Amino acid sequence: MFWQANKSSIMVLLLGVVAPFTAYFIIGSGKNGNIELAKQVLATSLCVVLFAAALLSFILAKKSPTLRIADELTEQHFEQMAALEAQYYGEDNITPPAEAYRWYQRYPATTIAAAMGEQIVAFVNLFPVKADIYEALRNGSFNDHTLTLDGLADPQAAPEEPLHMFLCCVLTEPAYRGLGLTRHLLSLAIEHYEPVQHRCQRIITDNVTPEGAEFSRRYGFEQVQTSSHDSLIFEQDYASFVNHVHGTRQMEVDS
């Protein structure tokens, strides 16, 4: 299709070049009838060029990948997410892709991602964890690299119990920052928990980069601890976090 589009481009270009020269030589004969014919040639050529250009744009638009919210994630997508994380920190701070995919298979709301074509370019991990995991995160003794499915809390179970939320990762490729993508993904993530939002009391982040810490500050988090693996632990009320997400307009410091 790309070659066909290129051939179309060449044909349009040739027509755009040849038609004026043809009209020029017709006019050069000096006859009024030929001048009228030249005008018709130019007008027809212009219409053809415009139509061909519109058709070419349509063809290219149909074939070009578009930025979209990924409907169904595969394990390959989680491998792409891990590769994005690896650009910023080491493997000892990255959840193995197969494990993160297990989270998603059991609780699809754990991961919201944006893709360009089939390539993940941004994602958010937000979910409740069990009380002991949350407390270990808060006191800095737990590295979520080791977090498994067993450590996640089922938001539909124990309807009277509070939920302890963990914003595990927020990452957007640099080329896609400044588009409001991070805020949009966060908004979609918190929408999933609206039915149980009254049970969501606190939310925590574990930041291994300065950019991550700055992101947490901008979204209302306050530092509570430095972890045993030298990351910065931030926390706030969940309702306050939701308000920051909904109220954010200029916050495009993506981590």
Q: Where are the model-predicted features located?
A:
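Hydrophobic, helix-forming membrane-interacting segments
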Residues: 1-61
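Hydrophobic alpha-helical core bundles mediating ligand binding, dimerization, or RNAP-core interactions
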Residues: 81-86, 100, 186-189, 216
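Conserved acyl-donor/pantetheine-binding loop and adjacent beta-alpha core of acyl/acetyltransferases
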Residues: 125-169
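Conserved acyl-CoA
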Residues: 155-160, 184-201
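Conserved acetyl-CoA-binding loop-helix of GNAT-fold acetyltransferases
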Residues: 169-172, 177-193
